[in-house]
Amino acid sequence: MAEVKQTEVNEKKAVETKAQRVERLKRSKNAWDHFDEIQQFARDGFDSIPPEWLGTYFRSWGIYTQGDGVGVVGGKNGEGKARPFFMVRIRIPNGLLRTEQVRTIATLAAKHGRGVADITVRQNIQLHWVTIESLPDVLQSLWNVGLTTTGACGDVARNITGCPLAGLDGQEIIDASPLALAIDRELGGNSEFYNLPRKFKISITGCRHWCSYPEINDIGLTATTRQRGGKHEVGFTLRVGGGLSTNPHLAVSLNAFIKPEQVISVVRGVAEIFRASEVLRQSREKARLKFLFLEHGWTAESFLAELQQRIGLSLDPGEREEIPADIHRDHVGVHDQKQPGLVYIGASVLRGRITPQQLHLAADLADRYADGHVRNTVMQNLLIVNVRKESAALVAAELTAAGLPVHASVFARGTIACTGLEFCKLALTETKSFARWLTRELEDRLPAFEEQLKLHITGCPNSCGQHWIADIGIEGKKIKQDGRMVDAYYFCVGGSVGQFASIARPVGYRCSAGTVPEAIERLLEGFNTRREGNENLRQFFNRHTNEELRALLAGSSVGPIERDLAFGPVPHGVEG
């Protein structure tokens, strides 16, 4: 009888979908309560780790299994034991760091990560090559300086992003960083929100430039003002349901004015709506909050009504807000702060990759010439803030000499790259080294090009490189060339956030990775010769047809690749 029951259990598991399996595992255990198991794995070695930890539980700890660098994914259910190493993502709310934290990260990268650290598009820092034996030391060292990896990955509230100039920008409406930290304390590591249907991303900013991209977050809070009873009041506009990946969707604006004291209740309420949405738990590919709007009939009005009922508040109607126009705010360079005599210095960190030596230098400079604070940006750059103005030139020179230029080309400043095939098991193409090579090629080919641009590189359809909001976005794929599979990219153009927010437009063109520089060179040369007046890249792309843009990319008229003309569930990846 026992054998029959076990057979039934095995058969039941065998027919589980991926979503059903993940949901079952999440219901059965909150991994945050089981650090002791991680310690035991460290004692027993990598081969002792069961598949459910490798594929599910480690993620809520901010830890992913690392790919093998050539795209091989081993193990059951695609969870992979291809390499016995981990990526460890450090959660850094609003990108705010103290120098002791920077030094700790640098030391860990050198000691456990083969000298590799990556700044991410959510203001985190990732370590690579971490072994299971090293993992407890890495986590404990981070805890000792007030950092954590908890909730940096997995089906939880991810790192809270915000303006890296919070409290420093003379034009900001409000310093929203205290609220960002409060949201992080409310949701980060909170067992009430351990089991969400999928990742949950939140952005809050008090600046006028929306540099934290509220349009692509599950919750986007942007500061606004109103006049009430002769008084000037500051609050927030609320957007929900933004996200990219294979179904890019810009967040929906709700007709509500959120007072600062209501922010936590509102954020919790949205998270509770998401948590309660069982319909989103049926498919991992359609589990983000945006799918309530895309596929389940929700509207801004119905969402607001549900939110107000859930939190027990009647929110004031929204106010007309000032949406920023075409902007490019990478924070690179030397800029005045609102504090007299102080500046912030933004260093361009090409593709987000930074060395332990560079991190130590940034910490040393911040202690010597400022007040010991460093900040990350969503464009994968690094800021030293509160620098005495008389020391700015010296700090800038030292950063530049160390490979962190303060005055960089538009290509270095505007290029974003995801983790790519080097470490990510989902990636189809290598992105980090490719981004460095591509940037240098474009600098050599177009040394006089000065139009600000966002050039985003992503190694698979999941859009971790955010190619859907770039001026020029390229998505990795494989194509057959001379009888073998090679890295290639397909192009989309004209993505934007702010007043003219739009998803980038696929133009039906792809080429091998080796010919991407000349394709972009032709495209930008066409922009230089054909632009009308002072139009920017977004306006130029909007004015030209896909056929015209393909001709610029290819150097001659070419027909479209139909599968590269649309976003959505169409697999853009591997071609025979």
Where are each of the predicted segments found?
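Peripheral terminal and linker regions in Fe-S/redox and tRNA-modifying enzymes
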Residues: 2-576
